[in-house]
Amino acid sequence: MTRDYNEIIDWMQLINKANTQLLHYRDMTIKANELATIQGMHIDLAHVSNSSNNNGTENKLIRYLEIKEQIKKIDKAVEPLNERQKQILILTYFNEYRASEYIIMNVMNLSDRGDYINLWDDALIDFANNYYDKDIIISCLSNLELRVVVVQGVR
């Protein structure tokens, strides 16, 4: 699909803007969600947000400490993986992060979900093409249900 340059904002700038504005999510949730995948549980990104805790600072601190503990566990869990396995794990996370599109849409001021999907797909494919070998890209993009069991060598 060809898009007019004036109709879209350069997606690399958008991704960089999103990453900059979402550091409080990324620092804690990237590894927490990798751990969640390994453990078969889900970490709700909204719980990390300052505006999502009804009981104020105490809940935020408890959630932060929980995630910090999970980060320690994920560090140990991925330590023995080789580089190829880590690549699969990262692309698996990319696929799962797409579920958090409302966060990215808000940061990027995208009003149309279709624009978001096009932007995301372009960014994911370009990211994969630039940083990962073709076999991994094909396996990840053709199977969005890829899970960490593949990383662990169990098919």
Where are these regions (language model features)?
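A short pre-motif secondary-structure segment
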Residues: 88-89
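A short structural micro-motif
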Residues: 95-96, 126
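N-terminal interaction/assembly modules
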Residues: 1-80, 109, 132-155
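A general structural motif at alpha-helix termini
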Residues: 92-93, 108, 120
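Helix-turn-helix DNA-binding module
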Residues: 96-115
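Short, locally clustered residues in the helix-turn-helix/winged-helix DNA-binding domain
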Residues: 79, 93-94
